Design a protein with these regions (language model features):
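Membrane-proximal alpha-helical signals and transmembrane carboxylates
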Residues: 1-340
Length: 340
């Protein structure tokens, strides 16, 4: 875990499992230190630890929002790229709060959970599988950091009671964290960045208001989304990027009020309402990312590939904010269960 310290230094916290055949209950060893470099901090810990600490065994690196906001992650990561014994497959994760506090609480208070490193790895992998966050490892964080026209995105976690919750994702611009999105917004972003294929993404939809239906189960529906296709068209008009994002979804009604969904007219009405809802949320998400100057979709990279002369003439992050980006969504309900 890494967070800021006085004088521009780093507060580092290392959590390591204790492997002892005489100990029946799994436990960990935690070391807090402060240094100007991660390598120096590791040497400090090795002078105190009963076991030699090897960076190649690191599974997860937790950064505070302050460090992420200062744009320090890329430079801190340099040791993992330079030293072949270090782990470039470790997760890069931003913590809403103190990484030091999170590591200590996970070790001391999460008595009903697996070992902290295993627990965190499991919830991160599960969140990626449900499109609640994006998988980001050291190697692809560093690659995107040096690629023009695309910005990083990392998982965002937080302590919640006696557990850790994946809140969504942290968004970056020019190497600095500039915003966050929740788990549902991350699912929609995944459909525009990559694809929802092989993901189990459940969308929390709101239904058309009906008189005398005030309970939440009457006003909402859980729809499991499947992505059929994605297409992004990029062009330059009047010296401005024009981008059209086409998304085609189908879905299952996992949870829905008792209704006549076996009626084709009702299904069509549902399709149209839900299609418009997803389109509006995707458009709202695009506008938010433009406002904060974050381009995790890599629209700039597409402009660079197709209109390289134009890309070289402009400052992409400034141009991106005023680009005309429009989302187009199709949706069709394919399964809803037999309730009659």
């Amino acid at each position: 875990g890494m967070e800021t310290a006085p004088g521009g230094n780093l507060k580092l916290t290392y959590g390591m499992p204790v492997i002892d055949p005489d100990v029946t209950k799994s436990r960990g060893e935690i070391f807090d230190t402060e240094a100007n470099l991660t390598r120096i901090a590791r040497d400090n810990v090795n002078r105190r630890s009963g076991k030699n600490m090897l960076a190649g065994k690191i599974q997860i690196i937790l950064f505070s929002k302050e460090i992420a906001g200062q744009g320090r992650i890329y430079d801190i990561n340099s040791i993992f790229e330079r030293d072949p014994s270090d782990a470039i497959l470790a997760w890069v994760v931003v913590v809403d709060g103190s990484p030091r506090s999170l590591i200590h609480q996970a070790e001391d208070n999460f008595t009903d959970k697996p070992r902290p490193s295993i627990y965190m790895n499991e919830i991160l992998e599960r969140a990626v599988a449900t499109a609640s966050t994006i998988e980001t490892r050291i190697y692809n964080y560093d690659l995107i950091s040096v690629a023009p026209g695309i910005d990083n995105i990392t998982p965002l976690i937080k302590i919640a009671d006696k557990s850790i919750e994946v809140k969504g994702s942290a968004l970056f611009s020019k190497g600095k964290m500039v915003g966050t999105i929740n788990a549902q917004e991350n699912g929609l972003l995944t459909s525009m960045m990559k694809t929802l294929k092989h993901k189990k993404f459940t969308y929390n939809a709101s239904l058309l208001p009906v008189a005398d239906e005030s309970y939440s189960e009457k006003q909402s529906a859980a729809i499991q989304l499947f992505q059929n296709s994605k297409k992004i068209k990029v062009s330059i008009r009047n010296n401005k990027p024009v981008v059209d994002i086409y998304l085609d979804f189908s879905g299952n009604a996992d949870e829905y009020k008792w209704d006549n969904l076996n009626d084709e007219k009702e299904v069509k009405k549902f399709d149209e309402h839900f299609q418009e809802q997803i389109q509006q949320e995707c458009q709202k998400l695009i506008e938010y990312m433009q406002k904060i100057g974050s381009d995790p979709i890599g629209i700039g990279d597409m402009v660079r590939a197709k209109n390289n002369d134009y890309f070289k003439k402009v400052d992409w992050h400034t141009t991106y904010k005023s680009a005309q980006i429009t989302t187009h969504v199709k949706f069709h309900l394919i399964e809803y269960g037999d309730i009659q």
